[in-house]
Amino acid sequence: KEVYLLFKDSATGEDGVFDPGSNTVGGSVEGKGKIGLIISKYFFELMEKNGIPTHYLDADIDKGIMKVRQLTVPNLEFVLRYFTAGSMCRRFTLPEGLPFDPPYLEVTLKDDEQGDPLITDRLCQMKGILKPNQYDEGLDILTRVGSVLKEALAEMNLTLIDFKIEIGYDDEGKMYVVDEITPDIWRVKDEAGTIPNQIDCAQLILDKIQ
């Protein structure tokens, strides 16, 4: 069975302000889906070159669709932080921009009603979301993605602050990076220290990779 992802023009944010950390759709930007697909294709192929398995198989840019592996995708987000930002600062009363070395890793349950709570390995297994060892394997993949992504963005004069990925697994339990790798999943700083929204960041990256 073939599976395809459609990249739409919707963007997350609230009150007309675009924010990759938001869980609500804040508007639509013409052409965003196509740009997101071009960027995702670029980064998925980069991950594969670095030995990180992804669900990406092929892409049709004109149609805005990506052909992907059919996988089981648990309702989790794997989060890596190189600096404090966003919800972490609100949760723990921390100033923005404090560095983490090594990076800070979190796993959250995708549940808007509960506010995407943090979840442990034990709870993931208790709820039947993950099998034994998959939590730690997911964190290992997250760290490896972070290293590749951080270096690639640094070459574009962008400093990676934090990002989140989703991970799926096949019938044998092998794990893959899924969904997308676009400015919708990360925060970055430019050379001026400004954090561009995901629309501006996408255009910045598109100009670099084309």
PLM feature segments, named:
Residues 98-115, 146-159, 182-186:
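Phosphate-binding core of ATP-grasp and ATP-grasp-like enzymes
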Residues 20-34, 118-141:
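Short histidine-centered catalytic/ligand-binding loop motif
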Residues 181-210:
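C-terminal helix-cap and adjacent tail motif
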Residues 80, 160-180:
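Conserved metal-phosphate-binding beta-hairpin within the catalytic cores
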Residues 98, 102-117, 122-130, 197-201:
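An exposed, glycine/acidic-rich loop-and-rim segment of catalytic or binding clefts
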Residues 1-109:
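Active-site loop/lid in soluble adenylation, ligation, and acyl-transfer enzymes
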Residues 55-61, 153-169:
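A short glycine-rich, hydrophobically flanked beta-strand micro-motif that places a catalytic Asp/Glu
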Residues 129-161:
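A long amphipathic alpha-helix within ATP-dependent nucleotide-binding catalytic cores
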